[in-house]
């Protein structure tokens, strides 16, 4: 593999040149308005009548719990996809995935889990949760377990140029992420993207299931981002 991932540091490296590649998550983050943790934690602390440190510690605890949960659920799905192993207590969750991918994952499908994708030209890399190949058509799917999933931005925030026509929210962020994966997979294989899907973890009446959210392949936006990155990289060299 010409690019490797250090799972502890989450750094992608070109194995031949030693050059570090920008992760897809970091790349997208460069076009987002950063969250002002200091400002908002002070406001929340004042509103709730507690110290700022209490709010920051609370947020940190919530983040850690969510990350652990996400890691566990991803492992459950990875074990099923790779080995058809269903972990005890997750039968309903896996069953909801099977039913919702029935028309895409076929008996003769090529299934790739945790597939590392990259582009040497633009020096970026990322890992797709699931790639499904049916002959010359492929589908990319991603599991999301975060608590918040918005389709709009209530503060009317948008991404930075050159994608400043897109609202800054979870749905758009993930759509861009999967679109970049699709673009890289097209370049690596010559195959065509048949669809992108987010599987969002939901709970209702003590039942856990996947909500299937189709995404549009935003190829032109991906090209805009990549060309902008390349231009900025050139200016910095």
Q: Across the structure, where does each feature detected by a protein language model lie?
A:
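Secondary-structure junction/capping motif
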Residues: 20-24, 88-91, 169
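Metal-dependent nuclease catalytic regions and adjoining charged, substrate-binding loops involved
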Residues: 168-237
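Catalytic cores of nuclease domains that cleave nucleic-acid phosphodiester backbones
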Residues: 58-163
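A short, sequence-level motif marking secondary-structure junctions
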Residues: 26-29, 146-147, 216-221
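Accessory terminal regions of nucleic-acid processing enzymes
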Residues: 2, 10, 82, 116, ...
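A structure-centric signal for secondary-structure junctions around beta-strands
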Residues: 6-8, 15, 67, 127, ...
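Charged, glycine-rich intrinsically disordered N-terminal tails and low-complexity linkers that flank
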Residues: 1-72
């Amino acid at each position: 593999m010409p690019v490797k991932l250090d799972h502890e540091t989450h750094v992608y490296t070109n194995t031949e040149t030693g050059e570090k590649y920008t992760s897809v998550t970091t790349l997208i983050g460069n076009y987002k308005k950063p969250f002002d943790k200091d400002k908002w934690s002070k406001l929340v602390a004042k509103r709730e009548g507690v110290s700022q440190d209490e709010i920051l510690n609370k947020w940190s605890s919530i983040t850690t719990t969510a990350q652990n949960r996400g890691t566990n659920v991803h492992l459950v799905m990875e074990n099923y996809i790779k080995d058809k192993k269903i972990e005890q207590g997750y039968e309903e969750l896996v069953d909801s995935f099977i039913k919702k991918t029935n028309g895409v994952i076929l008996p003769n499908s090529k299934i790739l889990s945790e597939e590392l994708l990259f582009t040497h030209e633009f020096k970026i890399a990322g890992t797709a949760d699931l790639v499904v190949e049916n002959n010359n058509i492929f589908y990319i799917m991603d599991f999301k377990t975060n608590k918040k999933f918005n389709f709009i931005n209530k503060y009317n925030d948008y991404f930075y140029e050159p994608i400043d026509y897109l609202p800054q929210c979870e749905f758009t962020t993930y759509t861009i992420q999967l679109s970049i994966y699709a673009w890289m997979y097209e370049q690596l294989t010559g195959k065509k993207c048949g669809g992108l899907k987010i599987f969002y973890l939901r709970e209702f009446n003590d039942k856990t299931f996947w909500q299937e959210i189709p995404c549009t392949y935003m190829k032109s936006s991906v090209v805009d981002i990549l060309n902008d990155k390349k231009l900025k990289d050139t200016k910095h060299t």
